[in-house]
Amino acid sequence: MTISKRDNVCLQAAGLATATTAAQVRTVNAIGYTINGRTYAKAATDNLWAPAGAVMAAGEVQVIWLYLNAAGTASVEASAVKKASTTTSTTERYTGGAFDWPDPVDKCCVGAMVITATGAFTPGTTSTATQCVFVNAGPDYGAPITY
């Protein structure tokens, strides 16, 4: 049997948000999730994920995927940094791209933190409150995350 991301899913929106420690991420809601056909639960938790990724400059975009394993332990995975245009010219304007949802093994993707840097941004150090958008995974990952 082949396991795919549809077998490791988050069953409810976690309500991802900036944590009390402003450079971290929390869940506002309790969630259920599955890994390899088994169901697990995680209570709403503050300071759950400490983002890690590349230091970014203004005009760069990166996604940090937020995972839980069967023990409820949090981990992260950063995408490659992509460039976004800062031009206002309609003829040179950047056409947005997309990040595909990951296909994790032995863990569940609870959501993503999309960073669109308007200035220097260091994951795990810079507050997630200003340059980040949280995307909650649900029963079906659906369309790629666009930027």
Which residue stretches match the model-derived regions?
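Beta-strand-rich solenoidal segments
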Residues: 1-147
